[in-house]
């Protein structure tokens, strides 16, 4: 049994924050941001617009593109680290609004959240537990941003992307590899927590961008070499 992506959907909030506008907030410039990231602007969720709202709009676009209705879905998996609330999770909020039945849960894996969600959904379908999954990556990162920190505020925005993943007799989703390395936890994190009783601390995102980039490149390189087995000549 295989799985394949049969449609996609996206949603970006209406508000756009350009590099020129950021120049008025923090010590940066359009040239500095473009040369290091390629980013020209980012979208920002409106007041009262939450992660579940972004996810829902992307989900309906994916359904429309596939010619399906919510009742055709029997699994929802969402990757997000900016949920509306601790619980119910974003997937369950979508389930209630869209009238979908079956398993519904969210995964917290930061930047790799959608990849984790897609891989888990793939395993559900390959095992025969589900037939058609709605998989979403959605974030409202602007709620975590310190707009005086140019290491982070220039990089992140808000948005959602969704795919419909379907069981198939032919290969579609070919391969995925999940991993984590907790020793780098201080390279990208937020202080705010619940069980650690630090919920009163400002929850701004903190990141050592150069180090995150180095770790990501090394890890991706090693995975590619491991699973493609290139020759020395390659």
PLM feature spans:
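Flexible, glycine-rich active-site loops centered on histidine and acidic residues
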Residues: 126-160
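Short, well-ordered amphipathic alpha-helical segments that serve as non-catalytic structural scaffolds
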Residues: 29, 51-66, 90, 216-226
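Conserved catalytic cysteine-centered active-site region
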Residues: 34-53, 80-133
């Amino acid at each position: 049994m295989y799985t394949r992506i049969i449609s996609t959907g996206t949603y970006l909030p209406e508000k756009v924050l350009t590099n020129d506008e950021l120049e008025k907030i923090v010590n940066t410039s359009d040239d500095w941001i473009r040369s290091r990231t390629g980013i020209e602007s980012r979208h920002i969720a409106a007041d009262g617009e939450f992660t579940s709202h972004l996810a829902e709009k992307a989900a309906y676009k994916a359904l429309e593109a596939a010619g399906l209705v919510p009742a055709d879905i029997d699994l929802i998996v969402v990757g997000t680290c900016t949920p509306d609330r601790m619980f119910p999770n974003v997937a369950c909020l979508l389930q209630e609004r869209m009238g979908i039945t079956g398993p519904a849960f969210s995964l917290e894996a930061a930047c790799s959240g959608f990849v984790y969600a897609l891989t888990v959904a793939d395993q559900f379908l390959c095992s025969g537990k589900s037939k058609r999954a709605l998989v979403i990556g959605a974030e409202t990162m602007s709620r975590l941003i310190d707009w005086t920190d140019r290491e982070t505020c220039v990089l992140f925005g808000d948005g959602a992307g969704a795919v419909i993943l379907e069981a198939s007799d032919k290969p579609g989703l070919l391969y995925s590899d999940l991993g984590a390395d907790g020793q780098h936890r201080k390279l990208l994190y937020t202080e705010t927590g619940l069980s650690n009783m630090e919920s009163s601390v400002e929850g701004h995102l903190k990141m050592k961008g150069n180090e995150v980039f180095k770790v990501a490149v090394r890890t991706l390189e090693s995975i590619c070499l491991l699973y493609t087995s290139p020759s020395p000549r390659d």
